[in-house]
Amino acid sequence: MTTRNTARAAGVFYFITWVSSIVGLIMYGPILNHSEYIFDSISKGHIVTGAFLEIICALGNIGTGLALYPIVRRQSESFALGYVVLRTLEASIIMVGVLPLLALLTLHQDLAQTAGTAGIQSALIAFHNFSFILGPSLVCGVNTMTLAFVLYRSGLVARFIPRLGLFGGALVFFSGTLQLFGAIDQVSKATALMAIPVFAWEISLASFLFFKGFKPGALARLGVPTSARSAEMPELITL
């Protein structure tokens, strides 16, 4: 695989992550926002589809780290590996957060008429919400800043993109911290506003990688031929 195709692959993985995460949230969002929804008009298809899309999002996260590693490691091995690990950690938390959504199906189908299920429902939703704070907020903030820093140093993409990533990553981490301590609500205007920069970072990075690819000058400085094959990927596997 050439470096151009590597960039396209990374861009596709980024597009997959944010499309699947947004559509997934739309699918199961009503269940998280309406306490009685599960007992009245829950749609099994919506929950299963939303959970599936969250898993796709998690796999896309891992894909971005693996796709970028062979190139980014030329600038910093430790930061490149750190990004892979952090993206994998974020993906793991997302997958764990899917489990309580699926458990809501059992609650509705088998225990809907049982006393005390409202408390169980609230606990399952809280489990999912806290996983969203830890993964797509706190861990995402750190891995965003990790990649943005190494991209800024390497010059592999337009300078404004890593600058946006550094700012957006710090802001979403700060937002997650405020949510964790109850200073702001998880679903609020403040939270949405603070998520805009990191959302813009992912769209900008994905678009640049897919349509333009890595900057040839930066690749040359890092000693990466534009026709280099990702035969370097086995080095990742042997780590």
Question: Where are each of the predicted segments found?
Answer:
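Hydrophobic, aromatic-enriched alpha-helical segments typical of multi-pass transmembrane helices
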Residues: M1-L239
